[in-house]
Swiss-Prot record:
The gene is CCAMK. Residues 323-336 are annotated as: Calmodulin-binding. The modification Phosphothreonine is found at T265. GO terms for molecular function: ATP binding; calcium ion binding; calcium/calmodulin-dependent protein kinase activity; calmodulin binding; protein serine kinase activity. The active site is at D165 (proton acceptor). PROSITE patterns: EF_HAND_1, EF_HAND_2, PROTEIN_KINASE_ATP, PROTEIN_KINASE_DOM, PROTEIN_KINASE_ST. It comes from the Eukaryota. Its EC number is 2.7.11.17. It comes from Lotus japonicus (Lotus corniculatus var. japonicus). Residues 394-429, 430-465, 472-507 form the EF-hand domain. Keywords: ATP-binding, Calcium, Calmodulin-binding, Coiled coil, Kinase, Metal-binding, Nodulation, Nucleotide-binding, Nucleus, Phosphoprotein, Repeat, Serine/threonine-protein kinase, Transferase. This is Calcium and calcium/calmodulin-dependent serine/threonine-protein kinase.
Length: 518
């Protein structure tokens, strides 16, 4: 693979819209500039929180023994998640790729602010999105899904990789074809034999986590098989196997393996499928089947899976579960964006007592839309033009520092909504006015409701000191989000938002704190 120290990501790829955000990364769509086919890719930027060691040139392409990977010594050890994903992707390139059911890595670029992974673009959508959109859904479709996930797991497990965060949103179809392969992706929390940083274990989704992970036991490939068992249970019922009133009860149910097939729709599911789920959701990891063993199971092969359409109630529940899951996942990912917790305080220290009036905030929004050529994102020069247009000369000298504060992924652009939230957070608002202000800042299309992405941005503004002390416990963020998730339609009206605040005073204190001066 060719290597040129002067080569930058933007030299070879046209970078376009954001496909998704995580607490420590952002994924954008890209197009390779060279070649006749103009290959489309997904570019995942892993943000470096610490400083680079001296000698790592900004914007330069680094090299390593395999595919130009940056060597681990060039990556701050404290940035455990970044380092971990680089290590795992290196192992995948060496021992797994290419594989029809595991995401492919094409290229790697490192600069002083992070690492950019150029990945295979999976444009076919998430696993559950496709299932709920189908005209017909039968056990055979569910078996085909399990078969592909098991094939991907078999390959990564042979390479001594444990995914550790297997869930529906980490399984995407390559394209929109009916027979498109299903790809396992997002190996940021995965572990390999020679490296597992303890901080990685703080993350993950409790609904899919194994009993041994909750009880601080040894994490192995069999932990992924438990997660696959949870996915299969949901595929055949429309709801998760462990449902409880609170997070601690759910943890105990998982540790004890306390689930059932009593609900009436399970009567229509084959005994072979239920036996398979029971084997996957066995508390003792050694008694769970391996991915290789799963591939030879008669139900997974399709021999014993029913081809008759499932009970419509199951599909309806899947639709509801999917909408709820996506809204929660977006919020959780954004809450973990660690640097944004402190932005309100940092912004106040920059601009002193300069509090924007409501009409100035509205003017800021309008000028952003008018001047910025890239939708909601602005370059530094565009941000300066916005301040000039608003006749704010006192803030212009601070523009580079404010810009740097909000350039979350060091890509040279800032998100208009984050700037708006930052300035509005300097206002001293109370009661409904504060709730309305917080809500309106993210209702960017003035639709009267906020989408999952907008809810995520709102939670993202929570100051660190206002979060519960047990925030790192598995599933705690799920519990917080459940307080606001009134229904499962994928959107939240102001009345729903307000009702959630009135039901729980601690939640109101958390959210309103970002709108009050320190």
């Amino acid at each position: 693979m060719g290597y040129d120290q002067t080569r930058k990501l933007s030299d070879e790829y046209e970078i376009s819209e954001i496909l998704g955000r995580g607490g420590f990364s952002v994924v954008r769509k890209g197009t390779k500039k060279s070649g006749n086919e103009k290959t489309q890719v997904a570019i995942k930027t892993l943000r470096r929180l610490g400083s680079s060691p001296s000698g790592t040139g900004g914007g330069q392409k680094s090299t390593a023994t395999v595919m130009g990977f940056p060597s681990l010594r060039q990556v701050s050890v404290s940035d455990a998640l970044l380092t971990n994903e680089i290590l795992v992707m290196r192992r995948i390139v060496e021992n797994v790729s290419p594989h029809p059911n595991v995401i492919d890595l094409y290229d790697v670029c490192e600069d002083s602010n992070g690492v950019h992974l150029v990945l295979e673009l999976c444009s076919g959508g998430e696993l559950f999105d496709r299932i709920v959109a189908q005209d017909k859904y039968a056990e055979t479709e569910a078996a085909a899904v399990v078969r592909q996930i098991a094939a991907g797991l078999e390959a990564v497990h042979k390479a001594d990789i444990v995914h550790r965060d297997l869930k529906p949103e980490n399984c995407l179809f390559l394209d929109s074809r009916k027979d498109s392969p299903l790809k396992i992706m997002d190996f940021g929390l995965s572990s390999v034999e020679e490296f597992t940083d303890p901080v990685v274990g703080l993350f993950g989704s409790i609904d899919y986590v194994s009993p041994e992970a909750l009880s601080q036991g040894k994490i192995t490939a069999k932990s992924d098989m438990w997660s696959l068992g949870v996915i299969l249970y949901i595929l055949l019922s429309g709801y998760p196997p462990f449902i409880a009133q609170n997070n601690r009860q759910k943890q105990q149910m998982i540790i004890n393996g306390n689930f059932s097939f009593y609900e009436k729709t399970w009567k229509g599911i084959t005994q072979s499928a239920k036996q398979l789920i029971s084997s996957l959701l066995t508390v003792d990891p050694s008694k769970r089947p391996s991915a290789q063993e799963l591939l030879s199971h008669p139900w997974v092969r399709g021999d014993k899976a029913k081809d008759e359409q499932m009970d419509p109630e199951i599909v309806s529940r899947l639709q509801s579960f999917n909408a709820r899951r996506k809204l929660r996942a977006a919020a959780i990912a954004s809450v973990w964006s660690s640097t944004i917790f402190l932005r309100t305080k940092k912004l106040r220290s920059l601009v002193g007592t300069y509090d924007l009036k409501e009409e100035e905030i509205e003017s800021l929004r309008i000028h952003f839309k008018k001047i910025c050529g890239n939708g909601d994102n602005a370059t530094l020069s565009e941000f300066v033009e916005v301040l000039k247009a608003m006749k704010m000369p006192s803030l212009i000298p601070l523009a580079p520092r404010i810009f740097d504060l909000f350039d979350n992924n060091r890509d040279g652009t800032i998100d208009m909504r984050e700037i708006l939230c930052g300035f509005s957070s300097l206002k001293n608002s109370k009661g409904d006015d504060a709730l309305r202000l917080c809500f309106q800042m993210y209702d960017t299309d003035r639709s009267g409701c906020i989408t999952k992405e907008e809810v995520a941005s709102m939670l993202c503004a929570l100051p660190e000191e206002c979060l519960p002390a047990d925030i790192t416990e598995p599933g705690k963020l799920d519990e917080i989000f459940d307080l606001m998730d009134a229904n499962s339609d994928g959107k939240v009206t102001f009345e729903e938002f307000k009702a959630a605040m009135q039901r729980d005073s601690s939640l109101q204190d958390m959210l309103l704190s970002s709108l009050r001066p320190s």
